[in-house]
């Protein structure tokens, strides 16, 4: 087994960090926990030889850090957060491969939507057309872009300082490229817009999706507002294995507005007024979520 060394918890002007000294690169996995909010990292092949967990006051989001030897070769690191809401984290090794670094994003100082950096992903695009309308034959990629642009317009009109679009045109973008773009944009949150489809034309309704429990509340707030459009409820779906739900760096939510395969839903999707109202409800859901986290 590899013996762990000292831990160091500190912050800079943007992030907090938990650094774990190790003699070599070891595999790890992480998870978010809520009530209380924690990041938990399991390091495989590691046995504790740690005598120092130094915690500096420059760390503002990391409230406490400790470890537990789960098994002879599994070291679990607990990172307790200062706020209930997870704002994201990233795990990497330093260039020498001897220090596992957990970078923790702090809660923004203001919960005003105007001061947020919000990313919007219009699903599909270019060669990837997505689903098609059951009667009209419209393509998902075109209408996700229309709704995304309406959301961008609504947010900017409301004063949001920064809105990042993964695409503004009908262009082909694969998932790794989108993830790299989003990592560079470093948003406070991401909303991805899609239109659903089923082999049964009776299936209908709106839904939201998330992967990590720490990001669930954003999808809940958006779904609550979407249901005000008198759409059927298809539900809030967790543990969703979608590429853009995978990054842990920022809260994210996938919105499946309605079903293109259902004649009633399709008719509404075609309506420009409905597209505007969807954008408005998503923005209201974001505002509700920010208000809850003040």
Segments from the language model and where they lie:
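Short linear recognition/processing motifs and adjacent strand/loop elements at protein termini
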Residues: 1-119, 126-128, 139, 143, ...
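Substrate-binding/active-site groove segments that recognize
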Residues: 121-124, 206-208
